[in-house]
UniProtKB/Swiss-Prot annotation:
One Gene Ontology term, aspect cellular component: cytosol
Keywords from the named record: Coiled coil, Cytoplasm, Golgi apparatus, Membrane
Organism name: Mus musculus (Mouse)
Major localization class: Golgi
Lipid bilayer topology: Peripheral membrane protein
Protein name: Short coiled-coil protein
Record gene name: Scoc
Role according to the record: Positive regulator of amino acid starvation-induced autophagy.
Amino acid sequence: MSKMDGLSTGEEEDSTFTSISLEDDTDHSLKSWRSRAESLLPKMMNADMDAVDAENQVELEEKTRLINQVLELQHTLEDLSARVDAVKEENLKLKSENQVLGQYIENLMSASSVFQTTDTKSKRK
C-alpha cells in the first residue's frame, strides 16, 4: 500500500506521524484549568455576592428612607387634620357666640328709647 491508501506497517506510521500522548497533557491541563476555576469561582461568587449585597443594601437604605419619609408625612397630615378639626370647632363656637351677641344687641336697641323713631317728637313741634 502507498501512503495515500493508508498505513500498512508500523514503520510507515512511525516515519510519517509523530505519536503524541494527549492523555497526560489533557489530564494535567484539565486539572490545572479546574484548579484555576475552583480557585476563581469563590472569588467571583464573593465578588458577585458583594455586588448583590451592596446593591441590596442601597435598595434597602432607599426603601427605609422612603418609609420614614412616608411615616413623617402621615404624622404631619394627621396633625394638620387635627388642627383643621380644632379650627372648625372654634369657628362654630364663635358663630354661635356672634349670633347670641347679635340677638342681645338687637334686643337692647329695640328696648332703648335712644333708638326709637322720632316721629312723636316731630309731631309735637
